[in-house]
Amino acid sequence: MQLIYYISEAINFIELNYQKDITVEDIAENCGLNRNYFGKKFKEEFGKTPQEFLMRFRMTKATELLEHSQLSIGEISCAVGYNDPLHFSRAFKNTYGISPRQWRDKYSSD
């Protein structure tokens, strides 16, 4: 099969499972590929590792929830696949330069 098929399968798997505690191994296994080969080809295609892509996808979903819901930071953390709200908040701040609460205050539509 062509690489584009496997990449498409990976993206689909991430979109359907980002809220779970999934790993790069899970994504590669779902595609039927070796983790190292999958990671190398994914990075060639997207310019970032599967883990970086997954984290960015989760952070994007988190911004949507922060802007358009009344869920707590802890609830949003769980909703996007982080078991620890503190770990989520640190990852969010590393990604966007502000905390989830600051993001909500700045961009919330409520």
Describe every region a protein language model picked out.
Residues S8-L16, D21-E25, E44-N83, D105-D110:
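Terminal helix-turn-helix DNA-binding modules in bacterial transcription factors
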Residues N34-R35, N83-D84:
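Short coil turns linking two alpha-helices in DNA-binding domains
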